[in-house]
């Protein structure tokens, strides 16, 4: 799958977040969108995922946009999980909309993310780091060709960051991964880097 943006731009009122963005993202390659805090990395990532409309330019996926949600998963600090559910219930709920990787059960996915001991607790009782693990699980273990990760190590301790890096290495090969971050620990594996400051 290829995602292509041509002369793309996004603005709020008179302020351009990015402009004249020309880039193609290809399957099997990992990309980092970098830049300082407040530079528009998250806005660009949301535009790539189709969650935000462009103010100018063109965005193409090479497939019908009404099926796009089946091909893209995302984890981001501003996207919440359903806290009244347990992680087991949440992943079953998620699976109704988007299939999970075929060779793993939900119990195995929970084990891979280190949440076995809390599998039957409501997510509302999780720490912020545990909630971030749930977000990463629903994104990385979705059986989709494109994974978008916005500041994926938010609220993770050193052990959680190491786990994130292991999950990326083990389960994301061959897929199109785009990470929005200014932290090398989050995007050090990426093959290509896009600095959003070049598109102001």
List each language-model region with its residue ranges:
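Helix-to-loop junction immediately C-terminal to a conserved catalytic motif
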Residues: 49
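Hydrophobic anchor residue at the start of the ABC signature
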Residues: 136
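Conserved ABC transporter NBD signature motif
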Residues: 54-70
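The feature captures the beta-strand-to-loop junction immediately N-terminal to the Walker
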Residues: 34-36
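Conserved ABC ATPase "signature" region
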Residues: 103-118
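Conserved structural motif at the start of ABC-family nucleotide-binding domains
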Residues: 3, 17-20
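Catalytic Walker B motif of ABC-type/P-loop ATPase nucleotide-binding domains
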Residues: 147-151
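Q-loop/switch helix immediately C-terminal to the Walker
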Residues: 78, 83-99
